Amino acid sequence: MQFDYIIIGAGSAGNVLATRLTEDPNTSVLLLEAGGPDYRFDFRTQMPAALAFPLQGKRYNWAYETEPEPFMNNRRMECGRGKGLGGSSLINGMCYIRGNALDLDNWAQEPGLENWSYLDCLPYYRKAETRDVGENDYHGGDGPVSVTTSKPGVNPLFEAMIEAGVQAGYPRTDDLNGYQQEGFGPMDRTVTPQGRRASTARGYLDQAKSRPNLTIRTHAMTDHIIFDGKRAVGVEWLEGDSTIPTRATANKEVLLCAGAIASPQILQRSGVGNAELLAEFDIPLVHELPGVGENLQDHLEMYLQYECKEPVSLYPALQWWNQPKIGAEWLFGGTGVGASNHFEAGGFIRSREEFAWPNIQYHFLPVAINYNGSNAVKEHGFQCHVGSMRSPSRGHVRIKSRDPHQHPAILFNYMSHEQDWQEFRDAIRITREIMHQPALDQYRGREISPGVECQTDEQLDEFVRNHAETAFHPCGTCKMGYDEMSVVDGEGRVHGLEGLRVVDASIMPQIITGNLNATTIMIGEKIADMIRGQEALSRSTAGYFVANGMPVRAKK
């Protein structure tokens, strides 16, 4: 089998590349996905409110676990990643958050990455998006990804939580992806007008999969990339339960889009990475790149939970006897409780003046429950998900064997810096202050978690060690740049090799301020133009907010 391009991973970025490259009918593409199809009849992935379900099984989730995390009481922590057409966009929380403009400007400070500034990237965010209220300088109107805005009156707790943030002295913003990210406001989500999850399988692949020049193989577990000298010339993979490899050759390029956990594993199994690690497993060295699998970053978050005195939370939706009606409303009308992820309000703040742009993110949820659907509080309640955005802690992903089915050693080194502890203590104390504003007085009951007895630095630290969880935002393991630990250049091309790029969240040099999916899609759009040799979209001239030393919050 011969193709112009072979794409490994039909996830958030891989599906973008498959769709854009096959717009040229003379370009042939093979898209390999280790998971299965995105079954449209399966409510677990298609109903926004069911977002916890895919994380509980292994049909759509790789369900990785970390090594014991040394600063988290040696807990082995979840590291869920999407498996199937759509990748993690098939199982994520559907929060459409791009990050802060200064994240990208910060990337562009690196020599060679100058064209990754916010204004260079904004046209690609817009290209990918169709926002339900129409386009403007910041948002697109005819892209493959459906973005739904929060509407007034959905739940009084959303408005009350935003108002409480403002009463605590923080800014109000009407668009967390617009002129000003900093502040509290409504959150956009990747949901279609029909109330379905807007994964990249739905948005991108639906328009491309009927093209004769696109071949899609599911249940195809990539074993390794084939090299001729320093040039990537093909891919070998295992189909289904077969132990006999299948191979295809790429006339132009192999495009690795397997995500921040799998992309470094595939490079390592293919002989690209740290020479000592590869020697341990008798893998012939193709090219030494010590940064492969290093620089692993993530967002940690905690839940601060409160009893709700008014019967306005989503608690009744958790009762089995209410679920048939909710399911029918969603299935036949695309409306009701099932049609939202219920992350419809949130915010970004600076916890201290020393941060030039927000370092703490909030998601508000009008029910008290863990993100993966466990430990639901058996009463009306609400909660804040809160966590730091740009932790200095760094970890790694390393293969444990040559077997592609064996999970790697994953270590995030969560909370390994004093800055982490300071940010989380600040986050808990600031959140309590916000939760005690007048806007929430009629709703706020007792604090369920951490509980009012948890007050000292030592008590707060112990709560974080035992209860902080991943936000499922791993990135950085094949970082873009030109220093000795970088893996790819500013166009995603792997250093020292030919015909091989990495295009996914692993190439982010530093994690962004917010959820990763929108930016991963943007990376796919931007590099698709580079691969095709097309001129980049014209730089945006939109303005954006920079705090420039402004006070963190207004004086009362």
Curated annotation (Swiss-Prot):
InterPro entries assigned: BetA, FAD/NAD-bd_sf, GMC_OxRdtase, GMC_OxRdtase_N, GMC_OxRtase_C
UniProt entry tagged with the keyword Protein biosynthesis: no
Active site: H473
GO biological process terms held by the UniProt record: glycine betaine biosynthetic process from choline
Gene3D superfamilies, alphabetized: FAD/NAD(P)-binding domain, Glucose Oxidase, domain 3
This enzyme's EC code(s): 1.1.99.1, 1.2.1.8
GO cellular component: membrane
Reaction equation(s) it catalyzes: choline + A = betaine aldehyde + AH2; betaine aldehyde + NAD(+) + H2O = glycine betaine + NADH + 2 H(+)
Residues binding FAD: 4-33
Pathway membership: Amine and polyamine biosynthesis; betaine biosynthesis via choline pathway; betaine aldehyde from choline (cytochrome c reductase route): step 1/1
Molecular function GO terms recorded: betaine-aldehyde dehydrogenase (NAD+) activity; choline dehydrogenase activity; flavin adenine dinucleotide binding
Cofactor dependency: FAD
UniProt keyword terms in alphabetical order: FAD, Flavoprotein, NAD, Oxidoreductase
Family membership: Belongs to the GMC oxidoreductase family.
Function: Involved in the biosynthesis of the osmoprotectant glycine betaine. Catalyzes the oxidation of choline to betaine aldehyde and betaine aldehyde to glycine betaine at the same rate.
Protein name (Swiss-Prot/TrEMBL): Oxygen-dependent choline dehydrogenase
Native source species: Shigella flexneri serotype 5b (strain 8401)
Gene that this sequence comes from: betA
